[in-house]
């Protein structure tokens, strides 16, 4: 699973105890939180000993009484004992993200700053392809080495 930072929130699906949930990837949350209205009524929960900070005022805060089996977005095996409260959407916190091997990466630019300035002056728009309709190749073409030296017209 991968998600580029955009105006859309990074959400992904997880399967907890065989039930599918969708949640927001939240690297700022220590623990995962399931929305109270999505928590199955037959799953046991207890009043939480600690409150939740950073999500506003939560009057009812519960925690699962059991450690639950979870499959991440790419079927990563994990376990979770989520908090449960009235929030609009589920939050996948670092307790799950670490088990899923989540990473935050910022790729190096494909082109040097100098070449980007030259291309911008020529009408290049970042994220668009080159060409009349800006629909050309968006990544650099890699040269392929022909180890057999075939196709150049001369037998060796």
From Swiss-Prot:
EC number(s) from the headed UniProt entry: 3.4.23.50
GO MF assignments: aspartic-type endopeptidase activity; nucleic acid binding
Enzyme class, spelled out: hydrolase
The Peptidase A2 domain, residue ranges: 21-96
Entry-linked SMART domains: G_patch (SM00443)
InterPro entries hit by this protein: Aspartic_peptidase_AS (IPR001969), G_patch_dom (IPR000467), HERV-K_Pro_peptidase_A2 (IPR051592), Peptidase_A2_cat (IPR001995), Peptidase_aspartic_dom_sf (IPR021109), Retropepsin-like_cat_dom (IPR034170), Retropepsins (IPR018061)
Post-translational modification remark: Autoproteolytically processed at the N-terminus. Expected C-terminal autoprocessing not detected. The sequence shown is that of the processed Pro protein.
Cysteine disulfide links: none
Domain G-patch: 111-156
Known role: Retroviral proteases have roles in the processing of the primary translation products and the maturation of the viral particle. Endogenous Pro proteins may have kept, lost or modified their original function during evolution.
Quaternary state and interactors: Active as a homodimer.
Protein name: Endogenous retrovirus group K member 19 Pro protein
